[in-house]
Amino acid sequence: MNADMKWLDNPEVFRVNQLDAHSDHCYYMDYADMEKSENPLMQSLNGQWEFAFSKNVMDRPENFYEENFDASSFDKIMVPGHIELAGYDKIRYINTMYPWEGKEYHRGAYSMESTGNEAGMFSEAEYNPVGSYIKRFDLSEQMREKKIRICFEGVEEAMYLWLNGQFVGYAEDSFTPSEFDLTPFIREKGNVLAVQVHKMSTAAFLEDQDFFRFFGIFRNVTLKAVPEVHLEDVWFQPTLNKDNISGRVSVKMKVSAPEGKKVSAHLVLKDRENNQVAEDNITLEEKAGSLVGVIDTEVGSVKAWDNYCPYLYHAYVELRGEDGEILEIIPYDIGFRRLEMIDKVIYLNGKRLVITGVNRHEWSAKTGRSIRMDEMTADIDCMIRNNINAVRTCHYPDQIPWYYLCDKAGIYVMAETNMESHGTFQKLGAIEPSCSVPCSIPQWREAVVDRARSNFETFKNHTAILFWSLGNESYAGDDIEAMNTYFKEKQDGRFVHYESSFYDRNYEETISDVESRMYAKPYEVEEYLNNNPKKPYLLCEYMHDMGNSMGGLGTYMKLIDKYEMYHGGFIWDFIDQALLVKDEVTGKEVLRYGGDFDDKPSDYEFSGNGIVFADRKEKPAMQEVRYYYGLYR
């Protein structure tokens, strides 16, 4: 198969040769490897890459992936990172408009206003920048003679991949991992990896989030050596019994192994003090080319997990051969909790759930959405310090470590799928869905269901996740209904959230478990709750903290005491989106917002809505948050 640039124009092509999404677990050959600072089965490709920038597809270096290609004219770029912040293209902030507004006329393929000219919409566009990356590497000795995969944790927005001159695959969905099998093409030494990243494809219609419009390889790139016997996917499902002191844990596994290989799975569960509290094992059975099995065992005494006491247990899955030899070990921390809805009220471990939350974009004043671990931990510390107990990952999945930090800190998570098509149905503030996507368009359906699938499969084991969110401001329709159906079929005990059923009440029963609104006034919340409400109420966005804001928070908080079905909400938002740059006159570092980069179209200072500045200094509004949220700890 050869790469086809026309895939950029086709919403039905969004993954080619990409491996199925799976759990985000780590794996090791033995317990000794778990103690090492670096996993010998992993090799990072982060660092300096060769790079060329092109203004569009036609100007790209077409054969740059060939092994004998002369890349002496290429520049150098650091991965992970945004291409714009490396000095290429234009830095641009937009809220709901698309980057092509005012320049080119685009409507989503197959929408009511489509022109029939979508065949070259992005592949032949005058403006659709391309980044061509080359990385040369040798395999580390520990990884040789094994199957090799590569994982791109985040690439905006569409990527083509080659290794040693051979086409490997294609992927969209900027914010979930894209994984490919390199085994047929890789060598021990002298490998040439080539990645071509396109700023826009049909995926752009689904990624119209309120943020700076960057592109490039902005999250980690890792080679993974896969043992002969390997846990491909694991689903931990710990449950807390009604007595709140005992529980069960189910572990569903899918394992790859040589044909005829006998493999057993052993579960060991330990508490925080490293005392063993449960153990069980099964022999895996062959099914559809894989080994599968489910361990289901009682845990006699457990401590419940919640925001007040985020108690985690250490689970270890050992894969063993017929002689008992350990072939692979998978560690994972899990918590026991019970989430339920009784008489239209949500309860966690038998107590009514109250959300004192924030929306949080991933952001660094220096590196944009390519954030570091120390910035994530600083955000967690800030939330704990200011009585924030929940976060909505607006409006895309975050980096994998964030979910582990939330598990550990007891921060409840609304895990949002990477979807927003705001600009297709709202124009100049008016709702006009004639060219909305995905809506009920069959050709877009699998693309958005795949995004839901990637979100669920990657993060399903995280105790902190209480809600799955179908996305943000993408109107309603059969395609979004199909996303909800996917989550419901998983029966994982979590609730599904989506706000835009408010726009089309024909779907209110089939795309959200909660009545969710943005910026509803307190009296509007009361009107709903006083008139035979069908569902519990959440404000997925409220208290828009732009400028001198947050003065009305106390009025909303009173609703928590007045109405059991009101569960609180998520402030918009946690952190300003602004970039540190040197002032042209003083030479000092200053924060610059939308519109400060001569970017048009732009929504200007609308990028600054945080309760912390982009450098993570708390704003005065945080005092209101700390006080009122603290009343409900």
What do the PLM-derived regions correspond to, one by one?
Residues 232-240, 247-250, 328, 382-385, ...:
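Active-site region of glycoside hydrolase catalytic domains
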Residues 161-163, 246-284, 293:
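Beta-strand-rich binding/interaction modules
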Residues 81-139, 143-151, 157-162, 169, ...:
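Active-site-adjacent substrate/metal-binding segments within catalytic domains
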Residues 3-16, 20-21, 35-36, 50-54, ...:
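Accessory beta-strand-rich segments of carbohydrate-active enzymes
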Residues 37-61, 78, 83-86, 128, ...:
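Substrate-binding clefts and catalytic carboxylate motifs of secreted carbohydrate-active enzymes
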Residues 143-146, 186-190, 299-314:
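Short glycine/proline/serine/threonine-rich loop/turn segments at secondary-structure transition edges
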Residues 1-111, 192, 196, 272, ...:
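Accessory carbohydrate-binding/adhesion or oligomerization-edge regions at the termini
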Residues 228-258, 624-633:
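Surface beta-strand/loop "capping" patches
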